[in-house]
């Protein structure tokens, strides 16, 4: 009896110690890894990298650099960008996403 209790306790403790990865993919694509430029955007007009006009979030969650760029191009010929601040279609301080 004691052996089975010890065995059960061992299995439970090892199961509780195992890291939970959930449904996330460890190789998932994060297009905006900069310190400030954390907001992925699809923009029409770039003004010297300081301001971008007619911007909004990508139509789908980016899974790769080519998919992010293709989804923005398909959404009215926009460019994939990573911006610091976006409000009402105006995005400020934008850079190119990782891999593009």
From Swiss-Prot:
InterPro entries per UniProt: Cerato-ulmin_hydrophobin, Hydrophobin_sf
Signal peptide range in chain numbering: 1-25
Disulfide bond sites: 32-82, 42-72, 43-55, 83-94
Outcome when changing residue 74 to R: In strain: P1
Keywords: Cell wall, Disulfide bond, Secreted, Signal, Toxin, Virulence
Major place of residence: secreted
Induction: Expression is higher in mycelial compared to yeast-like stage.
Single annotated GO MF: toxin activity
Outcome following mutation: residue 23 to S: In strain: P1
Effect of residue 28 to P: In strain: P1
Subcellular location: Secreted, Cell wall; Secreted
One annotated Gene Ontology cellular component of this protein: extracellular region
Assembly notes: Homotetramer. Further self-assembles to form highly ordered films at water-air interfaces through intermolecular interactions.
Function per UniProt: Aerial growth, conidiation, and dispersal of filamentous fungi in the environment rely upon a capability of their secreting small amphipathic proteins called hydrophobins (HPBs) with low sequence identity. Class I can self-assemble into an outermost layer of rodlet bundles on aerial cell surfaces, conferring cellular hydrophobicity that supports fungal growth, development and dispersal; whereas Class II form highly ordered films at water-air interfaces through intermolecular interactions but contribute nothing to the rodlet structure.
Family: Belongs to the cerato-ulmin hydrophobin family.
Protein name from the UniProt record: Class II hydrophobin CU
Organism: Ophiostoma ulmi (Dutch elm disease fungus)
